[in-house]
Regions:
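Helicase-associated low-complexity/disordered flanking segments
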Residues: 1-62, 66-70, 275-306
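Conserved P-loop/Walker A NTP-binding site and adjacent catalytic elements of P-loop NTPases
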Residues: 44, 50-228, 234, 252-277
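Conserved C-terminal RecA-like helicase domain
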Residues: 99-101, 109, 116-125, 261-335, ...
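SF2 helicase motor core recognition
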Residues: 150, 332, 336-353, 380-389
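Conserved interdomain hinge at the start of the Helicase C-terminal
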Residues: 232-258, 265-268, 322-331
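Non-catalytic terminal extensions of ATP-dependent helicases
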Residues: 310, 329-330, 413-416, 421-764, ...
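Conserved segment of the helicase C-terminal RecA-like domain
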Residues: 352-355, 359-361, 367-408
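Compact beta-sheet-dominated globular domain cores
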Residues: 826-860
Length: 860
């Protein structure tokens, strides 16, 4: 919880200690000479950090104090963060606003809290697509795209004194690299610190930066690794490799996979082999005591952790990832199985890295690892202050491991050796060997290939700056590090965009006396159109197409919002798979032949409500609002599907069998909640939509509260210190029910889900839901038999789901923390003599995100 974390920091003895050594930002006098800055900073490093700086750190900070740019191309663990601290401190002492940029929000957020701790909350702010905290602070943490857009919008006039660009190897990213290049080209008065462990040859970047800013660029690339690495290639099975490393005390071990499924498969295998001691398992059990593993994957994780095996990948809930990181930081996990995401911003101290392959699927094809990818992963081995060396082990391909096993079994017996049948690589398999490994070890990271693009958003940001926007866009292209052919294509693209903006009367020009032109916009452009919700204006316009009196109005609003969100691909694939499976069964029953079934199957995909209407509206919108051409709609039904099927988080995960993608679903639900809460005007919300928004908040917050708290305490315009004070206020009495509307919807959905399953005659699913409170499969079979003896069917229409058939008694809310609820079943005869009745455990329900009962019955 960000605000709570800020409150805790305020009690730290060293909180804000570096910021206290700088002049107050609001004072007029802020010019301390460089010698004094150097002395104050390194005294603080010695007294507070308790470390002695390395020569390359001192050199980098002296270069920065001299006004030079610095490219810090030094190994993982070599103290790049300390150099960035020195830059921020120097900026604070000289009245310059400084920026820290990173590629992912999680890393930006982590750095924000780190900087708050040393500089004080009044000196540090954060800006991401959906979060603004103390945005006028002298030190700003933000994503690279935020700074790039500001650079385009404000140019040389931007209040950006210096920038520490972390993970600068993203300069070579084909999709996002433009955001790392643009500031270098458009901020001539800004000082840059470019940092990464895997930059490769940066001479071209240094030359370009020096030419653009007329300032020297110092490259520091000769720092030794604080913890040297040793390398080992093995044909032992993975379990044996881990067992041997464990026996030699070479833990913690991070086993790197290139898919989430493979990571879980290995974790399960290792959990049964005994990779932890009795003492370690006892310590882990104590450390996770009180942790709630409420989801399907949570129960898997709990079992793995108790054996000493962790798992870490992007598909997990954030709180589970943080738990694994915390246990690793405490030295409690001997083995962690994860994906290659550990290379960016993941704080997991490890001694040994084991690569299960030297190839990966890049979204298009299987290929061998690039040198940069290899060093990014391998560089995490070896813990500064703990290890004298780190270990990097690469596993051979599976077929080679089996061949080695067969040869070892044959021993030195010539006859047996002759009989060994060597396996070959499967057809089309991209293989590797020890030579591949050796080449990767010796290879320097590839020279970064620059990337640039021109979009409507970029052009409009330049127009917003005033003056001759076309000249500046042409200069941006000409100054870029792209090839002549690429520049020609970029100029052509700029021609198209400017012509579109003129044709649609979005921009106009005025001639200047000096022969130049001034560009200006004729329409108001949303302040955040290029950030996290660029299609919000379209959504507001599209809402006018809906009839508020329609019974589907709330669901249609949800479908419109969902169409503007990023796809949760694993969830959509599961929906499509289930739809195709059901269609295949129907087609077989209808007697269709195989070829026809296959042809029809290709046409079946996941649900896309309002697709035709939305696409027609969007086509018209793009004609009037050209910058929307940078984006696209993606109709889908996840929130709507959950509402229509009365599903909670756990039930939805089970329904589509996506336990390994819990984090993906939760992030999507969180994004949907934010979009609904922020974008849909109050006057466009009916009672049902307000209920759904509240329910969604309860679901997200109960599964992982940080995703809601981070936005509500920080992103909705609340000052961080104010949020901290609010959350830390002593004596605050918490209500038993935090969000009555949302919790009521959660309970009503749970009750009606049972009604839907009664209609489908699904005693197995009902029993799975209710076995913990005495209504297992057999009890439900008996209840359904009795019900259908009296009535022909169950209604599940809007009337059956109405509030008239749901009764809530909250008289014991405060005394017993419970609600008595009764869902009357709308039977075929309209007798309404059957009902599901239960006493809801409010505390457990709110913490778990699914309804938990004290007692329960189904009867007439």
């Amino acid at each position: 919880m960000p605000a709570a974390r800020l409150a805790i920091m305020a009690d730290d003895t060293n909180y804000g200690s570096l910021g206290a050594l700088a002049p107050n930002w609001s004072d007029g006098e802020r010019n301390i000479d460089t010698d004094e800055i150097y002395e104050r900073f390194f005294e603080w490093v010695a007294d507070v950090k308790g470390v002695e700086p390395w020569p390359h750190q001192e050199e980098a900070i002296m270069d920065l104090l001299a006004g030079d740019h610095v490219i810090l191309n030094t190994p993982t663990g070599s103290g790049k963060s300390l150099v960035a601290l020195g830059m921020h401190f120097a900026a604070l002492c000289t009245g310059r606003r400084s920026y820290y940029t990173a590629p992912i929000k999680a890393l930006v957020s982590e750095k924000f809290f780190d900087l708050v701790e040393v500089f004080g909350r009044e000196n540090v702010g954060m800006i991401t697509g959906d979060t603004h905290i103390n945005a006028d602070a002298p030190i700003i943490c933000c994503t690279a795209e935020i700074l790039a857009n500001q650079a385009l919008r404000e140019g040389r006039h931007a209040d950006v004194g210096c920038v520490a660009m972390d993970e600068f190897h993203y300069y070579g990213d084909s999709e996002r690299g433009w955001a790392w290049q643009v500031p270098l080209l458009t901020l001539p008065n800004t000082q840059f610190l470019l940092m990464s462990a895997t930059l490769g040859n940066v001479d071209a970047i240094a030359d370009k930066l020096e030419n653009m800013t007329d300032t020297d660029v110092d490259i520091i690339a000769d720092a030794p690794r604080p913890v040297p690495l040793t390398y080992e290639y093995t044909l032992d099975p993975l379990e044996k490799t881990v067992e041997l490393a464990f026996g030699r005390g070479e833990t913690p071990i991070y086993v790197v996979h290139f898919s989430q499924d493979a990571a879980l498969e290995t974790a399960n295998a290792l959990a049964s082999t005994g990779v932890s001691s009795k003492e370690q398992r006892a310590a882990i059990a104590e450390a996770i005591k009180g942790t709630k593993f409420t989801t399907a994957f949570g129960k898997i994780l709990q079992r793995l952790l108790r054996t000493g095996v962790g798992i870490h990948h992007a598909g997990m809930l954030p709180r589970y990832r943080r738990l694994v990181e915390q246990l690793a930081q405490q030295g409690l996990l001997p083995v962690i199985c994860g994906t290659d995401t550990l290379g960016v911003g993941i704080n997991v101290p490890i001694h040994s890295v084991v690569l299960t392959a030297l190839t990966k699927f890049d979204g298009t094809k299987m290929r061998k690892l690039r040198a940069r990818e290899f060093h990014q992963i391998a560089g995490r081995a070896g813990r500064m202050g703990f290890d004298t060396e780190g270990l990097v082990i690469a596993e051979g391909p599976e077929f080679e491991i089996e061949n080695a096993k067969a040869l070892a079994k044959a021993g030195n017996d010539p006859k047996k050796l002759k009989k060994v049948k060597r396996k070959k690589a499967p057809e089309g398999f991209v293989t590797w060997n020890e030579n591949t490994f050796d080449k990767l070890i010796d290879a320097d990271p590839e020279t970064l290939v620059p990337h640039m693009k021109v979009t409507h958003s970029m052009v409009l940001n330049e127009v917003a700056q005033g003056g001759d926007a076309r000249y500046r866009i042409d200069r941006l292209i000409d100054d870029s590090a792209q090839t002549p052919e690429q520049k020609e294509r970029l100029h052509d693209r700029a021609d198209e965009i400017f012509q579109t903006l003129f044709d649609t009367n979005v921009i106009e020009t005025e001639d200047r006396d000096d022969g130049g032109k001034d560009y200006f916009m004729t329409v108001d452009m949303p302040d955040d159109f290029a950030l996290d919700q660029p299609l919000s204006p379209f959504l507001l316009a599209a809402l006018e197409l809906l009839d508020p009196e329609s019974e589907n109005y709330a669901l249609d609003v949800i479908s419109m919002v969902e169409a503007t969100l990023e796809d949760p691909k694993q969830v959509l694939r599961a929906q499509e798979r289930q739809a195709r499976d059901a269609a295949m069964i129907r087609m077989k029953e209808d007697g269709l032949d195989y070829d026809e079934r296959m042809d029809r199957l290709q046409e079946i995909t996941y649900p896309k409500p309002l697709e035709d209407m939305l696409q027609a509206a969007f086509d018209e919108y793009r004609h009037d609002v050209p910058w929307a051409n940078d984006y696209w709609l993606s109709p889908k039904s996840v929130i709507r599907d959950m509402v229509e099927t009365a599903s909670d988080f756990t039930g939805y995960i089970a329904r589509y069998n996506i336990a390994r993608s819990e984090g993906t679903l939760l992030r999507y639900l969180s994004d949907a909640y934010r979009a609904l809460a922020r974008t849909v005007p109050l006057e466009k919300r009916n009672e049902q939509l307000r209920d759904i928004i509240s329910w969604l908040r309860v679901v997200v917050r109960s599964i992982d509260s940080s995703l809601v708290d981070e936005w509500e305490n920080a992103g909705a315009g609340t000052d961080a210190s104010e949020a901290a004070a609010n959350l830390a206020a002593p004596g605050t009495k918490q209500a038993v029910v935090e969000d009555r509307r949302g919790l009521t919807v959660l309970v009503r959905n749970a009750m009606f889900r049972r009604v839907q399953l009664m209609d489908l005659d699904k005693p197995d699913e009902l029993g799975a839901l209710d076995k913990d409170w005495g209504y297992g499969v057999h009890e439900w079979e008996d209840a359904l038999d009795d019900f259908y003896d009296e009535h022909e069917y169950v209604n599940t229409d809007a009337k059956a789901r109405s509030g008239e058939l749901f009764i809530l008694d909250d008289s014991k809310e405060n005394s017993e923390h419970s609600w008595k609820v009764r869902q009357i079943i709308d039977d075929s005869d309209g007798d309404h003599d059957w009902a599901i009745t239960g006493t809801v455990d409010l505390d457990t329900t709110q913490s778990s995100g699914e309804v938990v009962f004290f007692d329960y019955s189904v009867s007439n």
